[in-house]
Swiss-Prot record:
Residues 532-541 have a biased composition (Polar residues). This is ATP synthase subunit alpha. NCBIfam families: atpA, PRK13343.1. The keyword Transport applies. Residues 517-527 have a biased composition (Basic and acidic residues). Its main location: membrane. ATP binds at G173, D174, R175, Q176, T177, G178, K179, T180. Residues 517-541 are annotated as: Disordered. The record marks S374 as: Required for activity. CDD domains: ATP-synt_F1_alpha_C (cd18113), ATP-synt_F1_alpha_N (cd18116), F1-ATPase_alpha_CD (cd01132).
Amino acid sequence: MADVTINADEVRSALNDFAASYDPGNVERVEVGRVSSAADGIAHVEGLPSVMANELLKFENGVLGLALNLDTRDIGVVVLGDFQGIEEGQEVHRTGEVLSVPVGEGYLGRVVDPLGEPLDDLGPIATDGRRELELQAPGVTMRKSVHEPLQTGIKAIDAMIPIGRGQRQLIIGDRQTGKTAIAVDAILNQRSNWESGDVEKQVRCIYVAVGQKASTIAAVRQTLEDNGALEYTTIVAAPASESAGLKYLAPYAGSAIGQHWMYGGKHVLIVFDDLSKQAEAYRAVSLLLRRPPGREAYPGDVFYLHSRLLERCAKLSDELGAGSMTGLPIIETKANDVSAFIPTNVISITDGQIFLQSDLFNANQRPAVDVGISVSRVGGAAQVKAMKKVSGTLKLDLASYRSMQAFAMFASDLDAASRQQLTRGERLMELLKQPQYTPYPVADQVVSIWAGTTGQLDDVDVANVADFERALLDQVRRTTNVMDSINSTGKLEDDAVAALKTAVAEVKRDFHGSKHGIEPGVEEHESLGATAVNQETIVKK
């Protein structure tokens, strides 16, 4: 038998040739993990060593999950969908994609979930692409100062707490104080801008409902549809029945849809209703993922949860198209406690707050805006000049009225100046009352506020202020061009003021002898006792 001779060089050469000529074809590397445990909307997955933070994972039954915790031994995954079909031992596959939502004009008039899927049974949505949920907010050099007004149609807000395009204005108050009503009114007030067809005026609206009752969301949608506002509005719905993961993601989904329009040079108004429930959902997710709790059991990064969301609202520079996204986040307080953890966080992030008082609401002062602690830090620069001119003393007059009210409760005699403050204040408070879902055009607001702050209503009975206001606005529309002048120039000229005074005199003349009460010379009446003060508007904390 011949001896076998092995030449190492030949073996090495043969192996090298084989390796060089090997063609794997279409074989691809696939990582497969398995569910090690699953409970309460959270799944722990083992065996995916290369997974990215916030990557989408697909479970065996087709449900998607979001990788939030990347631990040494396993991955904490938030299930985005039906949790019931996920069991221990099921396979989990990587998708290689981070969470994103479809975007585009097709979303106007639709109701969608936080993943962008339609919920209104109106068929598929035509999209222009996708946008990631976790994107950096515009930088300092990408922004421009807020200088364009965004009218809400609410006299108390547009006069004293003005909002500009690109601003973040918090709406805060106890439950059932009219927070959602203010946000919906702001959406309804954009209808005339939308119908104008002018891209510079049009405002696309997004209403993000987090943790609300499904019936409440349906009622908001019906209100928008009945008032012709649904055609320029998108509703992102994560009702109370949804999982904590979807409620946590809903505001980011709405923001991504709005950012697509903002970077396209358009103007957007987005309402987050409400961020308290988003924070609670994020707390639930974090505790289930075994993240260490902090104050009120919220995780340590709960401030970042809201700051990275609200910082996406901006007024972009001219180089980026000059688009804007205005944010109206809503926060619910407990017993008017604005010093709680989440309220103080969001107050520090936003550019101002509109504080709604339950005592004012119960006293029939609606909208129940507490002008004493409500503020707009940047909106004043965007206020219409005519409104700024007529509302300059409004906040001061109301503050004097509030302080004098408390004094009048115990005083048996008041001097003429004090009686005048009470007279003016009562009528201003009545003037600021406004029915729900009836936003006022800015020109109407200017005329109404002018009548109140210049004392034109001082001799009108408090009970008839609303009727007098309607009659005055009708008279001004019919007999003058003041409204057109305000709309075109944004100013209230001297000749317009003279025309308004003439209109007031004519309306008062019509009121004489009718059922409406005119109280000529109120300031000359004898002293008013405590019983003469309108007690229902007194709020003493």
